[in-house]
Each structure stands twice: as C-alpha cells, then as structure tokens.
Design a protein with these regions (language model features):
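Surface-exposed, active-site-proximal loop segments in enzymatic domains
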Residues: 90-106, 137, 199-202
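Aromatic- and acidic-residue-enriched segments that line the glycan-binding/catalytic groove
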Residues: 28-42, 101-104, 170, 250-257
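Catalytic pocket-lining loop regions of alpha/beta-barrel enzymes
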Residues: 143-295, 299
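Charged helix-capping and loop-helix junction motifs
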Residues: 102-110, 166-173
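Mid-to-C-terminal alpha-helical segments outside catalytic/metal-binding sites
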Residues: 1-15, 19, 26-84, 112-120, ...
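Short glycine-enriched loops at secondary-structure junctions
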Residues: 133, 188-192, 306-308
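Short catalytic/ligand-binding loop motif for oxyanion handling, primarily in non-cytosolic enzymes
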Residues: 24-28, 85-87, 93-97, 136-138, ...
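Divalent metal-dependent hydrolysis catalytic cores, especially in the metallo-beta-lactamase
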Residues: 54-65, 74-97, 124-132, 152-156
Length: 351
C-alpha cells in the first residue's frame, strides 16, 4: 500500500485514487512502417531514464522513466500516499486526424503496451485504453477488445476534427460505454493554434480549459445527456476546464437567449451537473471550493496529471490543504468518488 501521506499535521489517513495520470510506453514500433502514413510521433531515447517524444523532427515533450517504468511510478505513489493510479494514454497518440484504419492499428499498439506497463503495478495501476473515435464501430470494437484484455475504461479526446461530443457517431460510442459499463475520461487534445497562443504555454493555460468547457456544453446543449442512459460514467480533466466558473453565464444565456443557446437540451446547464464528474486538478483551495460548491461533493475526483510538469505533486495536495472540507468530504474526493466512477471495471482490471 501507499506510504505516508504528505498532508496537514494530524490529518486522518485517507485512501487515495488518482484518476488522471498518463503513460508513454517504450518499445513501440516505427508507426509509419506499422500503420502507414508519415509524420508520426516517435520516441528519441536520450538515456536509460530520459526520452523525448518527437513528432516528425519536432520536439514535442520530454518524458522520463515515470512514463514507462512501473517501479518508478510505485515509488512516486508511495512518496505521495497514493494507493491506486488510473493510467491513461498521452493524447498526442490519439491519431483522430488519421485515416481510421491507421488509428485502429495505433490504438492496438499502445493499448497492448499499456497493459505491459500496468502489469508491473501489483494491481495498483488501472489501465484505460484509447480508441479510434473517428470510426464509431471500430471504437466500440476496440473498447470491447480492451475490456476483455484487462483495461478498466477509456480515455477520449474532447472532439474529432470539427465534430464535438454531440456528434451522432461519438454519441453512439458513449451509449456503448454506458451499455458495457466502461467509465470514460475526457481529456483535451487538439488546442487552438496561432501566434497569440504560442507564448507562455497559452495553449495549455487557456486553450485546454476552453476546449474542455466546450465539450461539456456539447453534451448538455447538444442533448446528449437527455439521450444517453444515466448509467454513463464520464469525467472531465482539469476540473472541467472553465465550465464550473462560467456555469452561471451559461444558465443566463440559456434563459435569455434560448433561441440561440438551448439547442437540444431540455433544461438549463446547471440541471446537468449531476450527470458527470470532474477531477481536482485546479491547484488552489479557493478554486476547489468553487468546484465542490458547483459540482457537488460527490462529483469531484482527485487527479494529478502525473507525471507531467503541469501536474500536481504531491498528489491530492489541494484537497488536503482545503480546510473547508469535512473529513467525510475529503474522503469522497480522495477515493470514494473515484471508486464509484470506476465501478466494477476497476476490480476486473486488477484481477
């Protein structure tokens, strides 16, 4: 189990489930040779413990052994007092902009390699898969294959090209997730571009929150939550982006400009906050208070974005530092809500 928790002095020990971590497995083949096409990501190995994700000849992101070595992950989990990690793909590998047959092959490669990483996690690393979301039938088939192989759920991006999460094909996939009991983690992946966003990591600091906000609105105003079963378990990364802060604005627009805003929804956006979860990656107790008050104490799950540099370390720090939380609420955020989100799939994946 996890080691000592870095929290407030005298604070009770709570189990911790981190629903937002990423993996970059080693050993993937030349994707151009394996899947066709060009300009694929590849891994430049710089040392035994360091590498660089390359896209073509462009450096995309430095990564370390935490991304592929379960022993390193478990050591970090012990330092942070984390009992379980949900291990999801790194979105650069989603390949939604590729032909579907290529995306199917890429998904299979990374999903199988992810299982090799999590197999070394002594049952504490819970794998989520990726799917070729641009092809609903192929996405459903790959999800089924992965669930049978030991994955506990699926991570998807927030859109496919110009298709948001209310797209008919994506809704078909979400309905399938509800039917088979697969939890869905939504992570932004393709952010707005242009020179104004090339400074200060602005794509990550402004683009990602805006993209997630839009994907939540697509599910609400696109009428998806009115069509898919309530059994769908879906969680949005990064605290739901800017959606929680601007929920009042969305409600106001729904009432005052319903001709433009209501779309296929049957109620204002605030009526749907019990249909989805968000993680706790907001870093500040005041922001977490807003998140809990807006979403409800049952709808916020600890996430960290481990092992990337914009993630939270130690994991769950903002939850432990937030003195407005009762002990019972803290327990919900640190683990109980995540266990409900994961459901039986977590235990199936850890057999």
């Amino acid at each position: 189990m996890a080691g000592p928790v870095r929290g407030l002095p005298g604070q009770a020990r709570h189990p911790v489930v981190d629903v937002h971590t990423h993996v970059v497995p080693k050993g993937w083949p030349d994707l151009g040779a394996a899947c066709g096409g060009s300009g694929w990501p590849w891994l430049r190995i710089d040392s035994e413990r360091a590498a660089m994700i390359m896209v073509g000849e462009t450096e995309f992101r430095p990564v370390g052994a935490q991304c592929w070595d379960p022993a390193v992950r478990l050591a970090d989990m012990a330092d942070d007092g984390v009992d379980v990690q949900v291990v999801s793909p790194t979105p650069v590998f989603f390949s939604y902009d590729r032909p579907a047959d290529q995306a199917v092959k890429v998904a299979r490669i990374f999903n199988d390699l992810t299982l090799e990483v999590t197999a070394g996690g002594t049952g504490r690393l819970v794998p989520f898969c990726q799917v070729p979301l641009q092809d609903p039938d192929a996405a459903c088939a790959e999800l089924d294959r992965c669930l049978a192989a030991g994955h506990a759920g699926v991570e998807i991006g927030n859109h496919v090209g110009d298709r948001d999460l209310d797209d008919a094909g994506i809704v078909t996939f979400l309905q399938h997730c509800a039917e088979v009991g697969a939890p869905v983690f939504v992570h932004p992946w393709d952010m707005p571009g242009g020179p104004r966003l090339d400074r200060w990591m602005a794509r990550w600091l402004t683009g990602m929150p805006a993209e997630t906000h839009l994907s939540v609105l697509a599910l609400i105003l696109g009428g998806v939550f009115d069509r898919v079963p309530r059994s769908l378990r879906i969680c949005f990364a990064h605290g739901g982006g800017s959606f929680p802060f601007w929920l009042g604005r969305a409600d106001n627009a729904w009432h005052r400009r319903g001709d433009l805003v209501r779309g296929a929804s049957s109620a204002p956006p605030s009526a749907y906050v019990d249909r989805f979860c968000v993680d706790s990656v907001v870093f500040d107790p005041a922001a977490l208070r807003l998140l809990v008050e807006t979403m409800g104490e049952d709808r916020v799950l600890v996430g960290s974005d481990y092992p990337y540099p914009l993630g939270e370390r130690p994991v769950g720090d903002v939850v432990r530092r937030s003195d407005f939380l009762t002990d019972g609420q803290r327990d919900k955020l640190l683990s109980a809500n995540a266990l409900h989100f994961l459901g039986a799939s977590m235990y199936t994946s850890r057999r």
